């Protein structure tokens, strides 16, 4: 993951830095999108990687939508790569 062209950015994001857009939510999405792109859209694995990263925070498991969806669930769904 970190040996790609954008590997330095992804490493910084994994470490919890806001290294791409400066917006935590956008950086979360960008990070998840890149992980999904490389793992064949294994959302469970992406969730585990995110939780192990410095990006993890309480917001990930908080409900943010009226349908009961958490921030993490919505971010993972939005990061799914259509091929």
PLM region descriptions:
Residues 1-83:
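Modules that initiate DNA replication and primer synthesis
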């Amino acid at each position: 993951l970190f040996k790609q062209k954008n590997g330095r950015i992804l490493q910084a994001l994994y470490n919890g830095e806001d290294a791409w857009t400066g917006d935590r939510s956008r950086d979360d999405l960008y990070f998840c999108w890149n992980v999904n792109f490389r793992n064949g859209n294994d959302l469970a694995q992406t969730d585990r990687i995110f939780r192990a990263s410095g990006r993890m925070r309480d917001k990930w498991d908080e409900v943010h939508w009226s349908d009961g969806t958490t921030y993490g669930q919505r971010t993972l769904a939005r990061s799914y790569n259509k091929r």
